[in-house]
Swiss-Prot record:
Cellular component per GO, a single term: extracellular region
Protein name (database record): Subtilase cytotoxin subunit B
Domain notes: A patch of hydrophobic and neutral of amino acids (residues 89-94) forms a ring around the central pore of the pentamer, which interacts with the A2 helix of the SubA subunit; some mutations in this patch prevent SubAB5 complex formation but still allow some targeting to the host endoplasmic reticulum lumen. One residue in this patch, Thr-92, is the only residue that contacts SubA from all 5 of the SubB subunits.
Chain segments carrying region Hydrophobic patch important for binding to SubA: 89-94
NCBIfam families: AB5_pltB_like, PRK15266.1
Amino acid sequence: MTIKRFFVCAGIMGCLSLNPAMAEWTGDARDGMFSGVVITQFHTGQIDNKPYFCIEGKQSAGSSISACSMKNSSVWGASFSTLYNQALYFYTTGQPVRIYYKPGVWTYPPFVKALTSNALVGLSTCTTSTECFGPDRKKNS
């Protein structure tokens, strides 16, 4: 390998390692988490020729959260089928879960007004209202 090729390859590798487009992970954010939630509502539909589903969940204290997933939309769209199957299972069984969501993703006004702007980004099982498996999204103090 010539010196020129070496520096070209090293430069390319250096640029790739500095790329800010890192993997999106459910545990990255510091907000958007409700624990000990029972999914009480389930809705499916289609928008812009893409299927979507939405859930609403309630905590025992009465707080509620809604979130939606849309196939092949947003960075979380690739998880649509997995999230759909898990959400439907948890809705059917009534098992308490932790709902991870990203606020403000959906922006179409009629959709947001009727459902939510929150994107569903993950689900975890819970053994109590506060003890759940998976990342714990705590806001920075």
